[in-house]
From Swiss-Prot:
One of its GO terms (molecular function) is zinc ion binding. Keywords: Metal-binding, Nickel, Zinc. Ni(2+) binds at residue 2. Disulfide bonds: none annotated. NCBIfam families: hypA. It comes from Methanococcus vannielii (strain ATCC 35089 / DSM 1224 / JCM 13029 / OCM 148 / SB). This is Hydrogenase maturation factor HypA. Belongs to the HypA/HybF family. Involved in the maturation of [NiFe] hydrogenases. Required for nickel insertion into the metal center of the hydrogenase. Zn(2+) binds at residues 78, 81, 97, 100. PANTHER family: HYDROGENASE MATURATION FACTOR HYPA (PTHR34535:SF3). It comes from the Archaea.
Length: 124
C-alpha cells in the first residue's frame, strides 16, 4: 500500500508549512482543505490515500482537512501514425495508440503527485 507513504509525505509537507507560519508569529488553528494533482500512471487509489491520511493526521492540525484531487491524464503521441491525445489508463498497463494500435508511442505526464494548495485556518 504505497498510499500510506504518499499520505505521510502530504502530512509532513503541510505540517512543515504550518511550522513556518507559526515561526512568523501566526496562530494556526487547522487545515480545512488540501488540493492535490495526481497522475493516473501513479496508480494511487484515492480512496486508500484518503483513508491513510485520515488515520495518520488524526492528532494533528490536519485532522479535519478534506483531500481533493485533480487526476492528470497522461498524453500519448504515436510515432507510427502521428496520433496525439490522451492515454486511457487500464489495468493492463499497455500503452497502445488508440487509433492504429501501435506500441511505438511516447508518453508524457501522468506521473505527477503535487500538493496544489491548502486552506490553512488562522486565529484572528
Amino acid at each position: 500500500m504505497h498510499e500510506l507513504s504518499y499520505a505521510t509525505s502530504i502530512l509532513n509537507s503541510i505540517l512543515e508549512v504550518l511550522k513556518e507560519q507559526e515561526s512568523l508569529g501566526k496562530k494556526v488553528t487547522g487545515v480545512s482543505e488540501i488540493n492535490l494533482e495526481i497522475g493516473d500512471l501513479t496508480l494511487i487509489s484515492f480512496e486508500q490515500l484518503k483513508f491513510a491520511f485520515e488515520v495518520i493526521a488524526e492528532n494533528t492540525l490536519c485532522k479535519n482537512a478534506v483531500l481533493n484531487t485533480e487526476m492528470i491524464k497522461p498524453k500519448i503521441s504515436c510515432l507510427n501514425c502521428g496520433f496525439l491525445g490522451i492515454l486511457e489508463v487500464t489495468d493492463e498497463l499497455e500503452a497502445k495508440c488508440p487509433k492504429c494500435g501501435s506500441m511505438n508511442v511516447r508518453i508524457k505526464g501522468g506521473k505527477e503527485f503535487n500538493i496544489k494548495n491548502a486552506i490553512i485556518e488562522f486565529d484572528d
